[in-house]
């Protein structure tokens, strides 16, 4: 099944895209698609505590963006703000735009069809099977009553197609009947990514998805996310401490520091010294040619 966005021209002459397996009226026009996420002088944090100041950056469809920064720099806070799980500290509406529209202006059901989130801390769902977890990604497309029914009945129609496709893409279909509690960390991570894919959103946000995984699983996960961004035209943003993997797989970097965000493609940020300056630590050397770090003994 071809799940890439299908282009068409609206009555106004704008190039638009249907979202696969979403209602036919749900489409995004090319002007909005150029910058799916826009931050402009965004301030993040909590009442009485500012964590991120003057944050400006963009993320486009078809790209994998890695958010890098030290512990306590505000990566998780920024992702939660992007996901509208906590409000920006700015009073200016255009400080955070999603497809050209202020995030605060989206209704909850609209937002659930625009972006999905894979957080480090997830609700307890160990008693559910893999298929049941992935099916929950379709709840934004159901009425309240049918949403509760769906927890106890098999998915049908477009919902079943979306669930199956998501599990095929993440290689979770072979163990779809297994309880989540029986899976490895890497398998569990793929299940929650499958749930995000089943949700059918153009944007996916992930908070440290490679944490607690062994190295082969980290590589496999980054390959999957890169593939989804490029072939499904998803806008994917992930935070990570696996810097070298991010340099190899990400299309763009957001370097989150005390003075804001430095953004760009890895090769450019390596060549102009931005990465070396950002990770400047005694005894740590960065090779811009190989995009690798070495430790001086």
PLM regions: where:
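The feature captures the beta-strand-to-loop junction immediately N-terminal to the Walker
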Residues: 68-70
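Helix-to-loop junction immediately C-terminal to a conserved catalytic motif
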Residues: 83
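Conserved ABC ATPase "signature" region
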Residues: 135, 150-175
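Conserved ABC ATPase signature
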Residues: 179-183
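Catalytic Walker B motif of ABC-type/P-loop ATPase nucleotide-binding domains
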Residues: 204-207
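H-loop/switch region of ABC-family ATPase nucleotide-binding domains
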Residues: 240-241
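ABC ATPase nucleotide-binding domains
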Residues: 279-297
């Amino acid at each position: 099944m071809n799940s890439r966005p299908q282009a068409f021209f609206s009555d106004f002459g704008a190039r638009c895209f249907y979202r696969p397996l979403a209602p036919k009226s749900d489409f995004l026009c090319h002007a909005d698609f150029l910058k799916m996420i826009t931050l402009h002088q965004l301030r993040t944090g909590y009442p009485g505590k500012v964590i991120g100041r003057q944050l400006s950056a963009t993320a486009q469809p078809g790209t994998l963006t890695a958010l890098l920064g030290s512990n306590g720099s505000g990566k998780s806070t920024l992702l939660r703000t992007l996901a509208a799980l906590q409000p920006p500290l700015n009073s200016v509406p255009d400080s955070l735009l999603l497809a050209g529209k202020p995030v605060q202006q989206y209704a909850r059901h609209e937002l659930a069809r625009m972006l999905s989130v894979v957080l480090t801390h997830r609700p307890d769902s160990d008693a559910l099977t893999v298929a049941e977890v992935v099916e929950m990604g379709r709840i934004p497309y159901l009425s309240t009553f049918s949403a509760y029914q769906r927890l106890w009945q098999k998915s049908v129609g477009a919902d079943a197609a979306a669930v199956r496709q998501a599990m095929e893409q993440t290689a979770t279909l072979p163990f779809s009947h297994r309880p989540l509690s029986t899976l490895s960390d890497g398998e569990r991570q793929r299940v929650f990514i499958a749930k995000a894919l089943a949700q059918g959103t153009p944007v996916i946000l992930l908070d440290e998805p490679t944490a607690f995984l062994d190295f082969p699983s980290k590589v496999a996960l980054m390959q999957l996310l890169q593939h989804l961004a490029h072939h499904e035209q998803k806008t994917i943003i992930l935070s990570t401490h696996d810097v070298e993997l991010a340099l190899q797989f990400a299309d763009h970097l957001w370097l989150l520091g005390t003075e804001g965000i430095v953004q760009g493609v890895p090769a450019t940020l390596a060549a102009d010294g931005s990465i070396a300056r950002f990770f400047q630590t005694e005894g740590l050397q960065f090779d811009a040619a190989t995009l690798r770090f070495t430790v001086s003994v």
